[in-house]
A protein has these predicted regions:
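Acidic, low-complexity, intrinsically disordered interaction modules
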Residues: 25-92
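Compositionally biased, intrinsically disordered low-complexity segments enriched
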Residues: 23-24, 97
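Short intrinsically disordered terminal tails
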Residues: 1-2, 94-101
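Negatively charged, low-complexity tracts enriched in Asp/Glu with abundant Ser/Thr
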Residues: 1-21
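Residues that form generic nucleotide/phosphate-binding pockets
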Residues: 10, 14, 57, 95
Length: 101
């Protein structure tokens, strides 16, 4: 069964490493908050009302983070960078799809 808890379990390693991302439980679902370094203001906060919404958001965030790490923010993203990031994302998708069965 797909649950918010399973999404958090799948992305635990990523969330532990990315100090600017935080996921908070709230009355409407889960809120993904992005911080900007040590600023007391967040960059954004996006509500996910379903586990699928949270999964897709975190997968996108993970992919973006992976591309930044690959380029170190100093060069354009190449096709190979995108291919490697997609391969890593595929393992998350496979774990998520296992929850349907």
């Amino acid at each position: 069964m797909k649950t918010f808890e399973k999404v958090l379990e799948i992305f635990r390693g990523y969330l532990d490493c990315d100090r600017e991302e935080e996921v908070l439980k709230c009355s409407q679902g889960y809120l993904r908050v992005t911080w900007n370094g040590t600023s007391r203001f967040c960059v954004d906060g996006i509500l996910s009302r379903t586990p699928d919404e949270l999964f897709e958001m975190l997968l996108s965030d993970y992919s973006s983070c992976e591309l930044i790490q690959r380029t170190k923010g100093r060069r354009e993203v190449t096709e190979e960078d995108e291919k490697q990031a997609e391969l890593l994302c595929q393992s998350f998708r496979e774990q998520w799809e296992e929850e349907e069965s």
